[in-house]
């Protein structure tokens, strides 16, 4: 359950409640947190982040660009051009007013 989104700095963070977590699991995470010198909450955040965004993952854009290069759709020069002209600002919500 994600009850709300809190804004912190320039990004939003979610608050997550985990129900029915077995005591053995909570105890193991507490021990793991102590071994890493951080709070249980910080340990859980680290576990979730590593699970959701593992190191070495291939991002979708990079994957699609590699496919295009393999089939001759984009040269390295064209790929660089797209990378340098990409819009990085967040999209604005549509307004019908």
UniProtKB/Swiss-Prot annotation:
Coiled-coil region list: none
Assigned keywords, A-Z: Plasmid
Keyword Cell membrane: no
Gene3D superfamilies, per the entry: Met repressor-like
SUPFAM superfamilies, per database record: Ribbon-helix-helix
Residue pairs linked by disulfide bridges in the UniProt entry: none
Pfam family, one: FitA-like_RHH
Keyword Cytoplasm set for record: no
Tree of life domain: Bacteria
GO BP terms: regulation of DNA-templated transcription
The protein's role, per its UniProt record: Involved in plasmid stability.
Name of the protein: Plasmid stability protein StbC
Species for this entry: Pseudomonas syringae pv. tomato (strain ATCC BAA-871 / DC3000)
Gene: stbC
């Amino acid at each position: 359950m994600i009850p709300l989104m809190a804004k912190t700095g320039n990004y939003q963070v979610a608050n997550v409640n985990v129900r029915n977590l077995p005591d053995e699991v909570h105890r193991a995470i507490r021990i793991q947190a102590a071994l890493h010198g951080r709070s249980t909450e910080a340990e859980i955040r680290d576990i979730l982040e590593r699970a959701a965004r593992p190191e070495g993952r291939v991002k979708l854009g990079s994957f699609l660009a590699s496919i295009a290069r393999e089939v001759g759709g984009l040269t390295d020069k064209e790929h660089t051009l797209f990378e340098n002209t990409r819009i990085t600002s967040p999209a604005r919500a549509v307004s019908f007013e």
